[in-house]
């Protein structure tokens, strides 16, 4: 809390200082133009006042400041052996061989397919009268007759295709948010997928509605699958109903996890008097810059099991400025009965809105957006390209069983030359993983589930709960060991196994973070030594295979460039 308070004090000081300078310079301009005090000193004051106001307006209405840390960090990659070309991947990522076809559906006419409505009143609170009037004016509907509507992309030449249902998040009710993923629908349709972008605008500009969003998504799935079985419909036989993926952005990214739960349940967790009967064959979830815990089923966090899960987050997200998707990622668990993966990708320079072409580069509305820094973003085209490639690889593995490039989800660096140039941080977990330790068992530093732990020559050795950032008020309910040292050669941390552990072909993986905050730091390096029961040793040095970046010094507002504070 102290860090947040100090940052608030610094920001307040600069805000007061700017206000004082503008007030003073405004008086100088007023004296010259209105009072007509045309003396030498008044002229100097007038010129100074004009400079101050021009600088302020340029600061306010400009895009802000550029960052150097991305290019500086990328230069550190010279320490890492660069991966060569991956055969066929460039062609794989290009537009596919199928011809995309686009249709619309909805209950109000003027669409290619006519659908119905759904009563969402059990899942969303009644609004005040003027809110209801406002909502019905723009949507022509109420919570009691929410439209089942959206847009469908599918491959013209193919049938029995896997299907992806996409849900947008909260935005202005006047924007057609569901149209913002046309680029993704066209791309995936060309690769043999049906892509349905669901219109949930009826629930925008309100709170406490994520459970209603989930029900609306599931009702859309039911309606589209019904059309899939109707010979008179243009989507007849296009969809493989055994291969369904859910995809969501922002609140939609959180909601797809709730929808997955509701699909498994027979009753609404918040009121069991309302029943469910969905049970669609949902195999995979893709969350894009998701929120978290806006809806808690029966007061619990949304925990998922035995489903493939992919989450992407931009480091420059000015709406969800903390990687909240990490919390849901860590609430995905696997049994040993199948083959599943959870993977996450953190993208430097990506914001919240550029994943949706209707939302754009400003993640907050006027007038607050005037303070946002947007000059340090990657382009919208690059941001969307990252989502397209990651989604295709993930869906091909999960829904089509294609593993050719599936290691993209565990080793993006192998494919880095095919991705837009920026920084990426990846983590993953597979269902066949065996954990040596995850630091969740107790507070004893010298124990691990599989054996014992020892450490020497560190200035700090502790286990602690992770936070998403220094200023984050919440915790991630995930623990790690924290080590700090000065003598690189002498310091060591050792885990000794009680019993031999059979190793698969995947090797040993470590999740690690560099907690240093200065971009000018040289890449962190340490060695991992593996000793077997016969005394044979294998040594791997970190910098020989990868680079562990320091924390990204992200600045979301223009004022942070003046105060020098990072997120």
Predicted segments, located by residue:
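Alpha/beta-hydrolase-fold serine-hydrolase catalytic core, especially in secreted/extracellular enzymes
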Residues: 1-67, 349-352, 358-495, 503-509
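Short glycine-enriched nucleophile-adjacent loop
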Residues: 253-265
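Short amphipathic alpha-helix adjacent to the substrate-entry channel of hydrolases
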Residues: 176-196
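Short beta-strand element of the alpha/beta-hydrolase
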Residues: 160-169
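Active-site-adjacent alpha-helix of alpha/beta-hydrolase-fold enzymes
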Residues: 303-380
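Gly/Ser-rich "nucleophile elbow"/oxyanion-hole loop immediately N-terminal to the catalytic nucleophile
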Residues: 157-159, 208-250
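Short conserved active-site loop signatures built around small residues
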Residues: 3-14, 18-159
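Extracellular ligand-binding interfaces
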Residues: 485-566
